[in-house]
């Protein structure tokens, strides 16, 4: 069915979001059109404000509205460990379990030879720079249990082991192919408690 141009454009915009197909995009577009002008304006303002005000922490790469982020400036955290994750959503998932008390490093992707993504294409150089001060004794790799997650963890291990840094991986309480952001808190807690050395 053909829709008027404004709604067709809105459907197209929604369908560009991850996990949103045409049917869901159409539903969201029609829902948005049915909202009050005030609610639509608030939605648009919040969207623009988030895009304008959020940045990536210059230390760890986490999404923040302050740079450096509140985690990196928290001196009560364990300075001897860094937990490496794929993206900022994974930091939030790990913080929910309230069991990990060190710092984080966000890669903003994974090494993916099949997709032409190499170590220089993700946020790895700044991790190595962070480790130069000698305070960190353990790096916990918390990438997803996928082929790309495994490739990334093995690369990190190969690079860091010669420097005498202990490199561990989350335990396999996480199902192969699963995303950390969707794991329940008990599973994440078990995975971090039973991590294995690489």
Curated annotation (Swiss-Prot):
Specify whether Metal-binding is a keyword of the entry: yes
* SMART domains reported in the protein's UniProt record: TOPRIM
Gene Ontology terms: biological process: DNA recombination; DNA repair
- Keywords for this entry? DNA damage, DNA recombination, DNA repair, Metal-binding, Zinc, Zinc-finger
InterPro entries for the chain: DNA_Rcmb_RecR, Rcmb_RecR, Rcmb_RecR_Znf, TOPRIM_dom, TOPRIM_RecR
Q: Residue ranges of the Toprim domain? A: 80-175
- Short name of any one Pfam family annotated for the protein: Toprim_4
SUPFAM superfamilies per the UniProt record, alphabetical: Recombination protein RecR
The reply on keyword Metal-binding is yes
Q: Where are the zinc fingers (C4-type)?
A: 57-72
Question: Which molecular function GO terms apply here?
Answer: DNA binding; zinc ion binding
Q: What does this protein do?
A: May play a role in DNA repair. It seems to be involved in an RecBC-independent recombinational process of DNA repair. It may act with RecF and RecO.
| PANTHER family, per the entry | RECOMBINATION PROTEIN RECR (PTHR30446:SF0)
**Protein family according to the UniProt entry:** Belongs to the RecR family.
HAMAP family for this protein: RecR
Looking up NCBIfam families in the UniProt record yields: recR
Name the UniProt record assigns to this protein? Recombination protein RecR
